[in-house]
Swiss-Prot record:
Family of this protein: Belongs to the ARR-like family.
Organism of this sequence: Arabidopsis thaliana (Mouse-ear cress)
NCBIfam families: myb_SHAQKYF
The organism's taxonomic lineage, starting at the top: Eukaryota, Viridiplantae, Streptophyta, Embryophyta, Tracheophyta
InterPro entries attached to this UniProt entry: CheY-like_superfamily, Homeodomain-like_sf, Myb_dom_plants, Sig_transdc_resp-reg_receiver
Designated name of the protein: Putative two-component response regulator-like APRR6
CDD domains noted in UniProt: REC_typeB_ARR-like
Length: 755
């Protein structure tokens, strides 16, 4: 066991024993000599230091007592460190003083008294373990340097020989060799020493890379912890406050007010934020371009956020815009059909046939589609107001989506009082009101319109901005189809529009006999969509495409008839079709007694302030001289009632008692004495009623005015339907019209006779 613990090299090691106890020195020396041949002992520490300095290479182990007197621990340890000699301490049985910490830390092992042979044997493993490690490190370093030097020298010598061979073979003269050669080993060592100095003074490339990598790791960790979610939210809030065009790193940092951030850090984060926004904006348009035909741009009048109430309005607007888009696409293929003219013979065949008092069907006669596809239209018999022009017809459309207004002389035939139509630019009449006229009963002719050929594309589109006339999409019928029909009449009828004209276009220049025609319609509203009762000057002219002239044979020829701004030939006038319920209606709700049945055109107008009558045959010279004011040249006392061929116009005050009107006697006053009449004539003398008008129906009235049943083709059929509606029906919106067809051949024959 002892032989295994004690190394073989222990015999060559010199041991120095330092102890002031002579007995202890003797016993230890005898035991140490068993393992080592050279053992030296001293009793004073100073002698030991001198021996260490003199025999620095011979002493390999020092064993010292920690309680030696006169020992300087500092000097003793310095000597041991310089010599690099292992130290073993001996601890006494009774410690009189504490050993130095430096000595205990420096010592390899400690022996406690009494010391035995086993302790000496175990001591050697601690001594040689430390010494062998130090020697091994030194030997490895020296061996490596020697090997590298030898290999490098051989390589350099080989290169030099190779270079010399190349130069000799090429027989090149005057050229310096590529590589410096080392002729001797001394020159190589000199070159190596210079390279080592340079390598030690300048850091290598690998070390720089490693240092940069460590710094980068630290910066990445610091960067991740720098921009957390809270700071990023502050960053976004600062950008939203400054705006997309005005944000800068400095201004963002001022708003964030974070002392841990620098201007450079905010700028770097802002640059990354912009890059992300650009990438998103580049990706979205590219995806949208793939399905550009299938996408629909939401209008600007959508209401946000999408609440329940807003979603309904948005859906209505979206559906209406989609419907208009589909109809434009369906009509795009039929635009070229407007570019040609049909011959006269074909026009006569396709010319619409009209029957007064019956239903109309324009679907078979249309060249460019229906007027308003699947939309009911009303023909209202509206009396004239002040002039002697007979009553005329107005095509109107039931539209409950137009805002209400209180215009004088306007009548809503299919609407409630709350949804009266608005007509901008229409002149008002003195003494007339919308309330009064809305109480009148009227007769309407139902004109159902539908498209018999659903496969045929529509030939024209009525392009109307729905939002400009404030339409309520929820109240529009499902059959609404804004198509316009153009009624082509004969070219020789000068009062009809030109067949080549655009749909619903009126030539203002041709209307020279009425100067105010520009004010009859608003550019944003289709006049065919409204029911209106004209006032004093609201005449629908024969020159427009809104009226159809009805020439009659049995009309009293009275020549020129006075209007407000000019004279209209009598042959161009529309025959009067008087609704008896229109006559004599005032604010008080009373009725006027009927008049005599004469071959005259009876026109009724109601006012709450004025009452006047106009004879048909007047002295034109007198009228021209008194024409300065259309309402001042006729006075109540100047009005006469001729025996024959009179056109009576009654304006009754709302305060007049109608019971005394039965006894009225027509005045026989000469028109030349109009200006000499007194102003105090009672109103009972102004109006005469001879017959009971309630006993007259539409058929008897037509016979009296020259419209026989043979001429006007008034045979009863399942397609003829005349609706007589009263005030309560006019105030409602739920009017439903039957979809029947009819042909008004009488209009065609009457117009052909004039040719």
């Amino acid at each position: 066991m002892a032989g295994c613990l004690v190394p073989e090299c222990a015999d060559d090691i010199s041991i120095l024993l330092i102890d002031h106890d002579t007995a202890s020195i003797a016993s230890l020396t005898s035991m140490l000599q068993q393992f080592s041949k050279r053992v030296m002992s001293v009793d004073v520490a100073s002698k030991a230091l001198s021996m260490i300095e003199k025999q620095k290479k011979e002493i390999g182990l020092i064993i010292a007592n920690i309680e030696m007197p006169h020992i300087d621990s500092h000097s003793f340890l310095n000597a041991l460190l310089l010599k690099d000699i292992p130290l073993i301490l001996i601890n006494p049985e009774i410690k009189t003083k504490e050993p130095s910490d430096l000595l205990t830390k420096r010592a390899c092992f400690s022996l406690d008294k009494p010391i035995s042979n086993d302790d000496i044997k175990n001591m050697w493993q601690h001594v040689f373990s430390k010494k062998s490690q130090e020697l091994k490190k030194i030997n490895i370093t020296e061996d490596q340097e020697n090997v590298m030097d030898k290999d490098t020298y051989q390589i350099e010598a080989f290169r030099a020989n190779l270079k010399r061979q190349r130069i000799s073979q090429a027989s090149l003269l005057g050229r310096r060799p590529f590589i410096d050669t080392f002729s001797t080993y001394e020159t190589f060592q000199k070159r190596k020493s210079i390279a080592n100095v340079e390598w030690k003074t300048t850091p290598s490339y690998a070390i720089e890379i490693e240092n940069k990598r460590k710094e980068w790791k630290k910066s990445v960790g610091r960067r991740k912890s720098l921009w957390n979610s809270e700071r990023h939210m502050k960053f976004i809030a600062a950008i939203s406050i400054l705006g997309e065009e005005d944000f800068r790193p400095k201004s963002i940092l001022e708003i964030m007010n974070d002392p841990n951030l620098t201007h450079r850090q905010v700028g770097s984060h802002l640059q990354k934020y912009k890059a992300q926004i650009d990438q998103i904006s580049y990706t979205l348009p590219r995806n949208e371009s793939r399905s550009i035909d299938k996408t629909f741009e939401y209008p600007s009048n959508y209401k946000y956020p999408f609440k329940i109430s807003d979603l309904t309005n948005n859906l209505i607007v979206s559906n209406s815009l989609w419907n208009s888009l589909e109809k434009k696409n369906s009509a795009s293929a039929s635009i070229t059909q407007f570019l040609f003219k049909k011959p006269i013979g074909e026009k006569e065949e396709t010319m619409p046939k009209f029957h007064i008092g019956g239903k109309l069907d324009l679907s078979n006669h249309s060249v460019h589609g229906n007027v308003l596809n699947k939309l009911s239209m009303n023909v209202n018999f509206v009396p004239s107001t002040i002039s002697n022009n007979p009553a005329y017809n107005i095509l109107s459309i039931d539209s409950s989506s137009i805002d209400s207004s209180s215009y004088t002389g306007l009548v809503s035939t299919g609407l409630s009082s709350e949804n009266s139509p608005i007509l901008y630019g229409l002149p008002s009449n003195d003494g007339a009101s919308n309330t009064c006229t809305s109480q009148m009963e009227s007769e309407r002719i139902s004109i159902p319109q539908y498209d018999p050929n659903q496969c045929h594309p529509h030939r024209s589109i009525l392009e109307t901005d729905v939002n400009q006339i404030d339409l309520d999409f929820t109240s529009i019928l499902d059959s609404f189809d804004p198509l316009v029909d153009e009624c082509l009449m004969k070219e020789n009828n000068r009062f009809l529009p030109n067949p080549t004209m655009n749909l619903l276009d009126t030539d203002i220049d041709k209307m020279d006999w009425v100067s105010f025609i520009e004010n009859l319609s608003h550019h944003d509203i289709n006049m065919n969509h409204m029911d209106w009762d004209p006032s004093t000057a609201n005449y629908v002219l024969p020159e427009t495409n809104m009226n159809i002239n009805f020439p009659e044979k049995h009309t009293n020829e009275i020549g020129w008839v006075s209007s407000q701004v000019g004279y209209v030939p009598f042959e161009n006038m529309i025959p009067s079709e008087v609704d008896i319920n229109h006559m004599g209606m005032g604010y008080s709700g009373g009725s006027i007694p009927p008049q005599e049945e004469t071959n005259t055109n009876n026109v009724g107008f109601v006012s709450c302030e004025i009452h006047s009558e106009i004879p048909p045959k007047t002295n034109m010279a007198i009228l021209e001289t008194n024409y300065s004011n259309p309402l001042d040249w006729v006075f109540p006392e100047d009005i006469t009632s001729l025996e024959t061929n009179t056109i009576q116009k009654s304006l009754v005050s709302c305060e007049t008692s109608y019971d005394a009107l039965d006894n009225m006697v027509p005045l026989e006053t000469n028109m030349e004495e109009m200006n000499d009449a007194l102003y105090d004539i009672s109103i009972e003398d102004l109006i005469s009623f001879d017959i009971d008008a309630n006993e007259k129906d539409i058929f008897s009235w037509l016979e009296d005015n020259g419209f026989s049943e043979e001429n006007n083709m008034m045979e009863s059929c399942e397609y003829h339907n005349i609706e007589s509606v009263n005030q309560s029906d006019d105030m409602k919106i739920d009017d439903n019209f039957d979809d029947y067809r009819e042909c008004m051949d009488w209009i065609n024959e009457e117009m052909n006779k004039d040719v």
